[in-house]
């Protein structure tokens, strides 16, 4: 019930959500301590993502959702999220990988709380503005 959080979902839906975040080894009746102490930080993060996917509506807001994950798992989950076809995905993070950056329809670049650039990966690189500078300095 930890994944479900008391909202009604079928077992099949919950299992698909666990598969989405690579936690197939978990069982729906698995004991999880209230404070998550019997899980790794990455597992806690992935359960949070699975909860979100289980109750997904039309817009998915992802705020640093892969921060506690290793690079390979983060890339896999980012790709799965970006492959969601029916939802609008707003993705907020400071840690990006080239493989996923190129999949975004539109990237907004903020500086001191204001949007200073927007466009696709290719457009932003071609404009040679703040995004280009951050990317070339290794900050993205």
What spans do the regions from the language model cover?
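C-terminal portion of ABC ATPase nucleotide-binding domains
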Residues: 102-140
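Conserved H-loop
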Residues: 95-102
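Conserved catalytic loops of ABC-family nucleotide-binding domains
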Residues: 80-95
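Conserved ABC ATPase signature
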Residues: 31-39, 43
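Catalytic Walker B motif of ABC-type/P-loop ATPase nucleotide-binding domains
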Residues: 60-64
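Conserved "ABC signature" C-loop
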Residues: 1-33, 56, 130-133
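Helix N-cap at the start of a conserved alpha-helix in ABC-type nucleotide-binding domains
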Residues: 71-72
């Amino acid at each position: 019930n930890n994944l479900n959080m008391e909202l009604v979902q079928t077992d099949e839906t919950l299992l698909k959500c666990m598969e989405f975040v690579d936690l197939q080894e978990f069982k729906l009746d698995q004991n999880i301590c209230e404070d998550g102490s019997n899980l790794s930080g990455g597992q806690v993060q992935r359960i949070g993502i699975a909860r979100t996917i289980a109750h997904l509506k039309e817009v998915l807001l992802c705020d640093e959702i892969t921060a506690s994950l290793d690079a390979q798992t983060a890339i896999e989950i980012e790709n799965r999220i970006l492959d969601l076809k029916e939802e609008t995905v707003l993705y907020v993070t400071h840690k990006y990988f080239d493989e996923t950056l190129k999949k975004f329809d539109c990237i907004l670049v903020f500086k001191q709380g204001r949007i200073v650039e927007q466009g696709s990966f290719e457009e932003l690189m071609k404009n040679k503005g703040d995004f280009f500078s951050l990317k070339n300095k290794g900050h993205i």
